[in-house]
Amino acid sequence: MDTIFAEATPPGRGGVSVVRLSGPKAHATLESLAGPVATPRMAALRALRDGDDLIDRALVIWFAEGHSFTGEEVAELHLHGAPVIASRLSQALLARGLRRAEAGEFTKRAFLNGRIDLAEAEGLADLLSAETEAQRKLAMRATEGELGRKADELRSKLIRAGALIEASIDFADEEVPDEVPEEALDLIKAVRSDIQGMLASYPATERLRQGYEVAIIGPPNAGKSTLLNRIGQREIALVSEIAGTTRDILELHTDLRGLPVTFLDTAGLRESSDPVEAMGVARAVQRAAEADLRIHLSVDGVPEETLVLGDIIVRSKADLGRGEETAISGLTGEGVAELLDLVYDRLRVRAADSGLVGHKRQAEALQRAVAALAIDDSLAPEFLAEALRQAAQALAMMVGRVGAEDYLDEIFSSFCIGK
């Protein structure tokens, strides 16, 4: 196994730069640069030298094999944050036979060495890309191994049910028993119900992980772009009295009280002889249909498009008068805070339905498991036992206990180099 290294901190100038090593030569390499560092898991200030060249004075620490994140020998060198120092250290490490780590290779080694399961690795990737508090909390549940523990619990029940069925076959007076033990059937029903519940929460979990989209739709000159600018508190969209100014969909990524929300400013909905504007309108209609929530904005408060349950109808340009409760003014800000309250309340309800399964790969594994368990209770015991084995294997694959090879490159390539 190669010993690898990479900067664990972002490249560029900063207060501190951390270089991480992992592999069988990590400790020996550290001592070749810093002198004896005998005590693991204890930081020490050392001069780093490559021959007669003093590279830097750094805080160093190492972890013994089996007691590190990767499961291998690991060393960390906390340097001063000038890029030239990390570059000079890299030269010294390459000269000692180490190689630069690939993206996500430290985490991949942690998985291969049994330090984390695949769901925890996916959770770590989500944590590193989290932009809001809700996403952070969701990712932390995954990194703490909740999904892996749930999968193991369900597998244990299936294994118990399978053992009861196998025992009924092995010790039956007849060649093949006619009935499946009642305890086994109860366990199968309980597992099937749990998996169906996990699958039911997948869409909400996936949306929270990816972020919600809220489309602002309505006729031309309804104030959609002005509203987007007001929400973003900066000029994002060009505002003009000329109808049809907005043609492309403009996006505003926001943290709405911990929820990841992207507001979409769309082209004004109308029939147009201008082919470019017509394309913009068509895209607006499609994107609005795909959005999680729609704000129907118009001067008269009458929506242009068919309503979907949960949509919000708002009369714009409240600064012009008429003082209705559902009116807003993107120009003055009147009613915008109340509108954002309403958007948050709508999305918060959906976020509350989130669970443990937030990745397509995980959901597909659960679908295979529940399909294997979609069996008639009157099925012959030997066939039922085989169905249980298939379901248990699908659960094991969900967290990478078996058959994870096809997913490794895709999952770990999303990490940064030093993770």
From Swiss-Prot:
Mg(2+) binds at residues 225, 246. Exhibits a very high intrinsic GTPase hydrolysis rate. Involved in the addition of a carboxymethylaminomethyl (cmnm) group at the wobble position (U34) of certain tRNAs, forming tRNA-cmnm(5)s(2)U34. It is found in: Cytoplasm. Homodimer. Heterotetramer of two MnmE and two MnmG subunits. It is an enzyme of class 3 (hydrolase). K(+) binds at residues 221, 240, 242, 245. Gene3D superfamilies: P-loop containing nucleotide triphosphate hydrolases (3.40.50.300), Probable tRNA modification gtpase trme, domain 1 (3.30.1360.120), tRNA modification GTPase MnmE domain 2 (1.20.120.430). This is tRNA modification GTPase MnmE. HAMAP family: GTPase_MnmE. Pfam families: MMR_HSR1, MnmE_helical, TrmE_N. GTP binds at residues 221-226, 240-246, 265-268. Belongs to the TRAFAC class TrmE-Era-EngA-EngB-Septin-like GTPase superfamily. TrmE GTPase family. Residues 211-348 form the TrmE-type G domain. Keywords: Cytoplasm, GTP-binding, Hydrolase, Magnesium, Metal-binding, Nucleotide-binding, Potassium, tRNA processing. GO terms for cellular component: cytoplasm. Binds 1 potassium ion per subunit. InterPro entries: G_TrmE (IPR031168), GTP-bd (IPR006073), GTP-bd_TrmE_N (IPR018948), GTPase_MnmE (IPR004520), MnmE_dom2 (IPR027368), MnmE_helical (IPR025867), P-loop_NTPase (IPR027417), Small_GTP-bd (IPR005225). GO terms for biological process: tRNA methylation; tRNA wobble uridine modification. The keyword Calcium does not apply. (6S)-5-formyl-5,6,7,8-tetrahydrofolate binds at residues 20, 76, 115, 419. Its cofactor is K(+).
